Regions:
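A short helix-loop-beta-strand connector motif used in the catalytic cores of GNAT acetyltransferases and
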Residues: 35-46, 99-100
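Conserved GNAT acetyl-CoA-binding A-motif
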Residues: 94-106
Length: 138
């Protein structure tokens, strides 16, 4: 049985395998950065199968005006079992009073469909555009 557990502190060694399993190499090639990112998160929810971490959702922000979903990961063999939805629902329930919850994801039919099913809309729906700045030297 899968359980969802809210954490304020998560150790790198407990979740690195998740990032590796989905190929998020920007994190796996910079474990120190990931460790700092984990420790500076607003909150992290873990999906546990017994003691094994099989998924997570990591939020950053102030928790009031802006909450950003920095990552939602479920091990590939556990995907399509409702774990990602359960993680997102738990996060949205806890931050239901936040002015806005945002995220950035790859533009695939699967991703857009999933996040729309969770109540998210593409920014152009609100006549907005998203922008990002990335340090390309790292």
């Amino acid at each position: 049985m899968i359980t969802i557990k809210k954490q304020e502190i998560v150790k790198l060694e407990d979740v690195l395998h998740l990032y590796q399993a989905v190929g998020w190499t920007n994190y796996t090639h910079q474990p120190e950065m990931l460790e700092h990112a984990l420790s500076h998160s607003l909150v992290i929810y873990l999906a546990l199968d017994g003691d094994a971490v099989v998924g997570l959702i990591r939020l950053v922000g102030d928790g009031f005006s802006s909450v950003f979903v920095q990552g939602l990961i479920v091990l590939p063999i556990y995907q399509r079992q409702g774990i990602g939805s359960a993680l997102m629902k738990e996060a949205l329930k806890d931050y239901k009073d936040a002015y806005q919850v945002q995220l950035v994801t790859e533009e695939t039919e699967k991703n857009v469909g999933f996040y729309r099913s969770m109540g998210f809309e593409i920014l152009s729906t609100y006549n907005c555009i998203g922008m990002t700045w990335a340090n390309r030297e790292k």
